[in-house]
From Swiss-Prot:
CDD domains: MTAP_SsMTAPII_like_MTIP (cd09010). This is S-methyl-5'-thioadenosine phosphorylase. HAMAP family: MTAP. Catalyzes the reversible phosphorylation of S-methyl-5'-thioadenosine (MTA) to adenine and 5-methylthioribose-1-phosphate. Involved in the breakdown of MTA, a major by-product of polyamine biosynthesis. Responsible for the first step in the methionine salvage pathway after MTA has been generated from S-adenosylmethionine. Has broad substrate specificity with 6-aminopurine nucleosides as preferred substrates. The gene is mtnP. The lineage of its organism: Archaea, Thermoproteota, Thermoprotei, Sulfolobales, Sulfolobaceae. Substrate binds at residues 190, 214-216.
Length: 270
């Protein structure tokens, strides 16, 4: 049973390179059980400033879970169980545009799903839900993230289309050119889907801070895991500053009428 002091209204899902935000003033680790199995790791819960926050490393500590094997349903369910209303996702991405440079942050507003073999919904029957993904991210949380990044002088692109591939391999040159020229995507990653739509089904406010770590192979610059890791390390301090400042601005719950996230199932259930 989850105790009251193990509740949090804000959740951080850390991606590649961010396995510990390092900004808790006090914290404890808890294990959360879900109907979908175990989340990626223990959840760290504690105080960041005066806010109660839950942190979950998406790939587990030590990056031991590849993107196509992550238990996304368990991760989102566990955060919901802890009382999380706001979910801030942090991800490493590749750039499909030369003007989205290494070290830039992107707050995407759209995505394209090219994944293949994942569990996409909590509603597998007998109850079925068709949630709208027209605007897949919480606009209130996105705007606040953009505003905060500007205040901190972090180079941030205010919109972008994230194409999510299955992984764990990187793209071929032909695929990369297709994502860029045909699909008109701006950034590429492997973990947004189904995390974003599961958060929507859970009626949580969700936004992604995408950190550009490399150019995809259209640029004829080879992509290596080592390069991604190096640039991610350089981005980590900026991410911590942004997370700390953004979290201090978030209210306990979304203001009435500020977004539709908490009503996402209102017209979705069949």
């Amino acid at each position: 049973m989850i105790e009251q002091n193990e509740k949090a209204s804000i959740g951080i899902i850390g991606g590649s390179g961010l396995y510990d935000p390092g900004i808790f003033s006090e914290s404890k680790e808890i294990k959360v059980y879900t109907p979908y199995g175990q989340p990626s790791d223990f959840i760290t819960i504690g105080k960041i400033g005066n806010k109660s926050v839950a942190f979950l490393p998406r790939h587990g500590r030590g990056h031991r879970i590849p993107p196509h094997k992550i238990n996304y349903r368990a991760n989102i369910w566990a955060l919901k169980e802890l009382g999380v209303r706001w979910v801030i996702s942090v991800s490493a991405v590749g750039s499909l545009r030369m003007d989205y440079k290494l070290g830039d942050f992107v707050i995407p507003d759209q995505f394209i799903d090219m994944t293949k073999n994942r569990e996409y919904s909590f509603f597998d029957g007998p109850v079925v839900a068709h949630v709208s993904m027209a605007d897949p991210f919480c606009n209130s949380l996105r705007k606040l993230a953009i505003e905060t990044a500007k205040e901190l002088n972090i180079k941030t692109h205010e919109s972008g289309t994230y194409i999510c591939i299955e992984g764990p391999r990187f793209s071929t040159r032909a695929e990369s050119r297709t994502w860029r020229e045909v699909y008109k995507a701006d950034i590429i990653g492997m973990t947004l889907v189904p995390e974003v739509n599961l958060a929507c089904e859970a009626q949580m406010c969700y936004a992604t801070i995408a950190m550009v770590t490399d150019y995809d192979v259209f640029a004829e610059i080879p992509v290596t895991a080592e390069e991604v890791t190096r640039v991610m390390a350089e981005n980590t301090e900026k991410a911590k500053k942004l997370l700390y400042a953004l979290i201090q601005k978030l209210p306990e719950k979304p203001e009435e009428g500020s977004c539709s996230c908490c009503n996402s199932l209102k017209t979705a259930l069949v």
